Amino acid sequence: MSCRVCLEDRSIKPLPCCKKPVCDECLKRYLSSQVQLGQAEIQCPITECNKHLDESTILYSLPHDDIIKYKYFLELSRMDSSTKPCPQCKHFTTFKRKTHIPNPTKSENKLKIQCPSCQFIWCFRCHAPWHEGVNCREYKKGDKLLRHWANEIEHGQRNAQKCPRCKVHIQRTEGCDHMTCSQCNTNFCYRCGERYRQLRFFGDHTSNLSIFGCKYRYLPERPHVRRLVRGSVCAGKLLIAPLLIVLGLVLGALAVVIGLFGLPIYCLCKKQRKRTRTGMPW
């Protein structure tokens, strides 16, 4: 049986969702890449199948190192609004009285959580480090403390990045810059914080000269030059695209004309040549 991914003939057990054959090696690589992107609900690798792989299939096929990550993302996707992970150590905390800091002095202090695992103190409502004397709304408007903490570089990377859609801060422990928010499923870049966008012919976030490209991929220290170059490339493509479309239409029309008139002439000449060789009269 041939694997639908690598096309090699192997002894393969079909996938339970669509009964299509995918070898163990290809399935492991695919699942591992999805876990690295923070996916808990993983779709079947077969493009024409829109179903999700069941948990047992994923756990059976995942490499051992990725099983812990997958279980974390799975728990994160299933939790309700009363349970959130600690911003520092990812330990899940359920909003109960026993997790509060004792003797709250204000109503806002009811949201003050101390992680039982790492003792980090944070706000349950906005999922940020605790902001003493400032409510969540005021803190979000001028969250200097949070931005300072998130922008601090530790172990060669910033502490956290804010999701461009739901504004939840996400901390990366390892993996590539392509992040998927577990709250709203937005794909964004951990380095620059921008959404992943792509448009055929104009490139994507990994393209150096694309208007959608990450600012750290091309001239990060010269933003004005970067915008000028990328804008010029985009403008050039916008000018070239109509010309290519017109050229394609002209060539297509020319091919049709040649086919309509050239093919009968070619057949007639071929028939004439054959008659000449056999000495047959017209």
UniProtKB/Swiss-Prot annotation:
<feature type="binding site">
    <location>
        <position position="136"/>
    </location>
    <ligand>
        <name>Zn(2+) 2</name>
    </ligand>
</feature>
<dbReference type="InterPro" id="IPR047552">
    <property type="entry name" value="Rcat_RBR_RNF217"/>
</dbReference>
<feature type="binding site">
    <location>
        <position position="123"/>
    </location>
    <ligand>
        <name>Zn(2+) 2</name>
    </ligand>
</feature>
<keyword id="KW-0677">Repeat</keyword>
<dbReference type="InterPro" id="IPR047551">
    <property type="entry name" value="BRcat_RBR_RNF217"/>
</dbReference>
<feature type="binding site">
    <location>
        <position position="184"/>
    </location>
    <ligand>
        <name>Zn(2+) 3</name>
    </ligand>
</feature>
<dbReference type="GO" id="GO:0016020">
    <property type="term" value="C:membrane"/>
</dbReference>
<feature type="zinc finger region" description="RING-type 2; atypical">
    <location>
        <begin position="163"/>
        <end position="192"/>
    </location>
</feature>
<comment type="function">
    <text>E3 ubiquitin-protein ligase which accepts ubiquitin from E2 ubiquitin-conjugating enzymes in the form of a thioester and then directly transfers the ubiquitin to targeted substrates. Mediates the degradation of the iron exporter ferroportin/SLC40A1 and thus regulates iron homeostasis.</text>
</comment>
<dbReference type="InterPro" id="IPR002867">
    <property type="entry name" value="IBR_dom"/>
</dbReference>
<dbReference type="GO" id="GO:0061630">
    <property type="term" value="F:ubiquitin protein ligase activity"/>
</dbReference>
<dbReference type="Pfam" id="PF01485">
    <property type="entry name" value="IBR"/>
</dbReference>
<keyword id="KW-0833">Ubl conjugation pathway</keyword>
<feature type="binding site">
    <location>
        <position position="23"/>
    </location>
    <ligand>
        <name>Zn(2+) 1</name>
    </ligand>
</feature>
<feature type="active site">
    <location>
        <position position="176"/>
    </location>
</feature>
<feature type="binding site">
    <location>
        <position position="214"/>
    </location>
    <ligand>
        <name>Zn(2+) 4</name>
    </ligand>
</feature>
<dbReference type="GO" id="GO:0008270">
    <property type="term" value="F:zinc ion binding"/>
</dbReference>
<keyword id="KW-1133">Transmembrane helix</keyword>
<keyword id="KW-0812">Transmembrane</keyword>
<feature type="binding site">
    <location>
        <position position="131"/>
    </location>
    <ligand>
        <name>Zn(2+) 2</name>
    </ligand>
</feature>
<dbReference type="GO" id="GO:0000151">
    <property type="term" value="C:ubiquitin ligase complex"/>
</dbReference>
<protein>
    <recommendedName>
        <fullName>E3 ubiquitin-protein ligase RNF217</fullName>
        <ecNumber>2.3.2.31</ecNumber>
    </recommendedName>
</protein>
<feature type="binding site">
    <location>
        <position position="181"/>
    </location>
    <ligand>
        <name>Zn(2+) 3</name>
    </ligand>
</feature>
<feature type="transmembrane region" description="Helical">
    <location>
        <begin position="243"/>
        <end position="263"/>
    </location>
</feature>
<feature type="binding site">
    <location>
        <position position="26"/>
    </location>
    <ligand>
        <name>Zn(2+) 1</name>
    </ligand>
</feature>
<feature type="binding site">
    <location>
        <position position="205"/>
    </location>
    <ligand>
        <name>Zn(2+) 4</name>
    </ligand>
</feature>
<dbReference type="InterPro" id="IPR013083">
    <property type="entry name" value="Znf_RING/FYVE/PHD"/>
</dbReference>
<feature type="binding site">
    <location>
        <position position="163"/>
    </location>
    <ligand>
        <name>Zn(2+) 3</name>
    </ligand>
</feature>
<feature type="zinc finger region" description="RING-type 1">
    <location>
        <begin position="3"/>
        <end position="49"/>
    </location>
</feature>
<feature type="binding site">
    <location>
        <position position="166"/>
    </location>
    <ligand>
        <name>Zn(2+) 3</name>
    </ligand>
</feature>
<feature type="binding site">
    <location>
        <position position="3"/>
    </location>
    <ligand>
        <name>Zn(2+) 1</name>
    </ligand>
</feature>
<comment type="similarity">
    <text>Belongs to the RBR family. RNF217 subfamily.</text>
</comment>
<dbReference type="Pfam" id="PF22191">
    <property type="entry name" value="IBR_1"/>
</dbReference>
<feature type="zinc finger region" description="IBR-type">
    <location>
        <begin position="68"/>
        <end position="136"/>
    </location>
</feature>
<dbReference type="InterPro" id="IPR044066">
    <property type="entry name" value="TRIAD_supradom"/>
</dbReference>
<dbReference type="GO" id="GO:0006511">
    <property type="term" value="P:ubiquitin-dependent protein catabolic process"/>
</dbReference>
<dbReference type="InterPro" id="IPR047550">
    <property type="entry name" value="RNF217_RBR_vRING-HC"/>
</dbReference>
<dbReference type="GO" id="GO:0031624">
    <property type="term" value="F:ubiquitin conjugating enzyme binding"/>
</dbReference>
<keyword id="KW-0963">Cytoplasm</keyword>
<keyword id="KW-0863">Zinc-finger</keyword>
<keyword id="KW-0472">Membrane</keyword>
<feature type="binding site">
    <location>
        <position position="126"/>
    </location>
    <ligand>
        <name>Zn(2+) 2</name>
    </ligand>
</feature>
